[in-house]
Amino acid sequence: MQEQYRPAAIEPAAQKKWDDARIFNVSEDASKPKYYCLSMFPYPSGKLHMGHVRNYTIGDVLSRFKRLNGFNVMQPMGWDAFGMPAENAAMKNNVAPAAWTYDNIEYMKTQLKSLGFAIDWARETATCKPEYYRWEQWLFTKLFEKGIVYRKNGTVNWDPVDQTVLANEQVIDGRGWRSGALIEKREIPMYYFKITDYAEELLNDLDKLEHWPEQVKTMQRNWIGKSRGMTVRFAVSDDSKQGLEGDYARFLQVYTTRPDTLMGATYVAVAAEHPLATAAAADKPELQAFIAECKAGSVAEADMATMEKKGVPTGRYVVNPLNGDKLEVWIANYVLWGYGDGAVMAVPAHDERDFEFATKYSLPKKQVIAVGDNAFDANQWQEWYGDKENGVLVNSGDLDGMNFQTAFDAIAAKLQSQGAGEPKTQYRLRDWGISRQRYWGCPIPIVHCEQCGDVPVPADQLPVVLPENVVPDGMGSPLAKMPEFYETACPCCGGAAKRETDTMDTFMESSWYFFRYMSPKFSDGMVSAEAAKYWGAVDQYIGGIEHAILHLLYARFFTKLMRDEGLVNVDEPFERLLTQGMVVCETYYRENDKGGKDWINPADVELTFDDKGRPVSAVLKADGLPVVISGTEKMSKSKNNGVDPQELINAYGADTARLFMMFAAPPEQSLEWSDSGVEGAHRFLRRLWRTVYEYLKQGGAVKAFAGNQDGLSKELKDLRHKLHSTIAKVSDDYGRRQQFNTAIAAVMELLNQYDKTDTGSEQGRAVAQEVLETAVRLLWPIVPHICETLWSELNGAKLWEAGWPAVDEAALVKSEIEVMVQVNGKLRGKITVAADASKADLEAAALATEGAVKFMEGKPAKKIIVVPGRLVNIVV
């Protein structure tokens, strides 16, 4: 065994050993329990970042732990390869997105392999490959035929200069990110998934997910947003019907969760696209201008929440069905046409948004809810104004004094008797629009025929292949300019037809990839029935909390869709979910001439610390001049505070990177980058290597201790007690608790006790062998390369076949224990006694201690309290 720890030599050797033995290549094996461990697959952006390293190390630790425990473990990997960044990079570098993507995949795959992850690379998939997205297209056509996928107009951000649709994040202050042109809202035909058909099941099945973080389940519940409320129809006033047709000329319909406040409505607000707004604006230029302004605004709900609320009165009126009040109709920029009825009733006295709007435009506020003796002030919003639970109705005629539920029932009865409303359950969740007017995505398998309409591409003509030799120019959809792509024959009538040139939302690919891993080369469907039956659901899923809503919700939705197609036999995709925290690092900057910030990489900064180790000042190494310390933030390119994993691996080795990531913080918490922490992790690995080296130098490996320990010295028994209690703790930390930092700390404590124990005797060397073999097995999930190498020196066999160490219960039974001695409740000494010492023996031993004799001062004991195994308290 070489004396020095050299990761650059041992890590490639260990990886070659695993690859040659193909130990991570897995197939269905009914003789073993299965364990499917999956970390969210990466977008091939070019390089791994530290967040990737943390995510995949967590998955690898769990996979290797389960492997040693006899499970048939699948840990696959692939690439979430479609998406806008590839198009942006392609335009910047004048290269096809496909070429850019495949180059990145090759480099990142090399990085993943250098970290020693126990990945079954035979299952590798890239979502941009036709053999993958073929089956996504197939499912789309099946769901289109069932009506779960449908086409309707949707609102998008249109850049009139680049002649293209922009994502919400590409609109900056109302202008296109490339052209700078003012963005318009446009209605275009788009495809939607009826996720709302599954809203109730998606909501209810959250209760089945016992091993998901409550925070994630709460976020999904709120996103689905089930509410019980009432549809209310306000009759359109006779003098306000001009230009309206059908039901729109008869009534304005709204949905409210607070019908108890209906008597307090003082106006109603409609979206700019509402027919009532259009009719009112017909002869009013100021309304037309406001409607145009609204249509130019963002279509993102998040932006709606933070933007300034604006409105204009239409001069049209509707009638409150409860009290006959005439309410003016306003056009407001905070009302969305695509959400609900595109209209809301406004109760300024009891809704904070309405209160602010009414204050801004001097509209009336009518109190109809009272809470205790609180006084209503129309000039100042107070939290109790919106209190549904504790309020009672006032200023509401014969409804006065009623609580929410009583008023709800009474108002429902009144409205239903008039045909003016009824109770309704509604969801915040909206159908999922999956059409994207971009190139680098999965083509939508629909053909548009003038004779036959929208025709799904037949299965035997799939996949509709995306041409890969295209370099986008940012001016509209490349596919819409390629007759060789869109010109085709109708599958029904054979006549000339046109392919759909939109592509699918990239959330589509990540909504089912975990099933494709089960049989990635299966050519007769999305997943083979045998593989789906064996692997079932993912046992452990790992990824960031930022995916709590959309990705995880869509994956749950797709699982139910595939179940209903008879493709899988599970209701939920992920049995257990771990959301790891971010990797964060200090940030530094200097202000530039334009008033902006030039961010400086931490490696280029020199710090000065106070006597408590806190940074007090920082200078740039290059010029010695000050930089601003800006606090700790998530590692990112924008803040220039990232650390390249490859540099870390080159300097210290993959095991050091893995150990630091697992030891620096519990997995669900943020991990703060620390150079000293990395050095500390490397020091521990050098110590582990040195410990085994010194042991072997003293006489080579021996047979590890096993069997009856009665003949061992107390010191060796204590070491074995520590060893087997460590096995129990680490097993629990890896398995149930998933707290890897405390598992590492436990092994460190074990090695500390080993260093203090004399193991020079023949029995001592056998116990030392047991301790070192076990420590290596316990650490293999986290630092597999060094452990693989040390195991071969200690044991000569294959560590991956060694199994997880078992707890020797006999070693946990102590023959002697330490008991505290107190006099009048104060600690005065300790005694070592037999573990089975009687009460009388404990009392006698305690009374004989030097501390007891001294502090009893010759007085007799009034009482002696014995807590078995812990203490003896002498009361004088």
Curated annotation (Swiss-Prot):
Question: What CDD domains would the database entry show?
Answer: Anticodon_Ia_Leu_BEm, LeuRS_core
Q: Which GO terms describe its biological process?
A: leucyl-tRNA aminoacylation
EC code: 6.1.1.4
Tell me the HAMAP family matching this sequence.
Answer: Leu_tRNA_synth_B
Q: Which protein are we looking at?
A: Leucine--tRNA ligase
Pfam families associated with the record: Anticodon_1, tRNA-synt_1, tRNA-synt_1_2, tRNA-synt_1g
Looking at the UniProt record for this protein, which Gene Ontology cellular component terms does it annotate, in alphabetical order? Answer: cytosol
